[in-house]
Amino acid sequence: TIALFTALSCSALSCVNAKMDTYAKHVDTRIGTGGHGHVFVGANVPFGMVQLGPTSVPQEWDWTSGYHASDSTVIGFSHTHLSGTGIGDLFDITVMPVVGKSVYERGKVGQPETGLWSYADRSKEISIPGYYSVPLTRYGILAELTATDRVGLHRYTFPKSEEAAIVLDLENGGCWDKAEDTHIEVVDGNSIRGWRHSKGWA
């Protein structure tokens, strides 16, 4: 009886997982990213605390989610985004992988030398439920993101270089979001801690 129950349980779970996988394939995560949709693109789970995805250089109304279909600039990957609101906020803790010397500023569109931002190769962008990846053309880096209920996970594949680095940007957010107090410290060889207090719409 126990063996039969186990077999039936496994079969039932397999059916549920198969259905979930099938439904996820139909999700278009880019709906609402053009026009005035203000929709965030990136990695998250339903009702999760993290919305991990790219944040762009422009701070105009159509970019309040940090992403717009017409633009491929990336200043980094922020852990929190508002989606569909039409007003920007959050963008807390932006992470940007870099190679070589960079100006540690947001920069201006069309002028990469003014900041650390990169163009993203949107032709190779992957955005599916729970996973996001895109190549950063300036640095030759592949960025991959995923998320759990409370944590954003990053994986960066760098080219061979002695000048590879990861920038933790506590200053630059997005539209309406302004950092008021920030702090970061190195705890040990594997840990950092800090905070970012910002003022925005919400």
Located regions from the model:
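Bacterial N-terminal signal peptides
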Residues: 2-12
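Accessory carbohydrate-recognition regions in carbohydrate-active enzymes
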Residues: 18-202
